[in-house]
Amino acid sequence: PVDGQVWYNTTSNTVKANYINPGAWATGNSLNTTRYGLAGAGIQTAALAFGGLPPPAATGVTESYNGTNWTEVNDLGTARYRLAGCGATNTAALAFGGAISPEVLKNETETWNGTNWTEVNNLNTARFVLAGAGTNTAALAFGGGVPAVTAVTELWNGTNWTEVNDLNTARRKLAGVGASNTAALAFGGGPPNTAVTETWNGTNWTEVNDMGTARYSLAGAGTNTAALGFGGYSPTGVTETWNGTNWTEVGDLNTGRGYLGGAGTNTAALAFGGYITPGATTATEEWSAGPATVTFDNS
């Protein structure tokens, strides 16, 4: 179907029209463990949430989402918060970086096989509040705090991390999306709050059009040509969709928050956890957008 296309049924005397649903967030079932500064991987119907700060201490708690409910599974080997993660499903993910306190940064990397986390080779640069993209065998880690802001980018080939070309704008508390380590998008972050967006082609970062709303500690979902950015600080529900060229503001999260986790695509995303003054939340929301059909009759 094409947006704007209309069909008329001469038998039922009804008209159908195809249109693009701009999208909306709907409340889903909550996480079991309240936390913020967590990471996510997977898709809306098969997601993984891991790490974070409940508080008072960093956690390794991992939960798997089946499209309806969250179920606690085996913990990360290294408890940490403000880490990054990536992965195509809730059975194959990667966790890297993070901290157990602002003074104790981590470079540990762990891979998830659907049952257990296994420690693999470390990042070269220990850091927290970084972003990630890709899969558990082809990932990208970029930005973050060491604790000062950094532009360092590292590429994961399933065995080792290799430092590659830096971001153009050093920042932390940014978001990242992408299907592989050769095609990624970095957006938002700080300090100060920024709307800067950069796209990665496997070799270099290139600055492209900015987000509409500058913010940090936001989450993302999707790819470098079809992304969704949502949440952030000061706690906001602002959601923007990226079409490969421009950002467009769409429907807000019902629960505005920062330091949240994200997973999925730009038409079917998941937002979970995060921080709303005065503390962490278990709130989960599902994003739905894309082609839709409406039927009209003569009543």
Tell me what each language-model feature is.
Residues 1-299:
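Polar, enzyme-active/binding microenvironments
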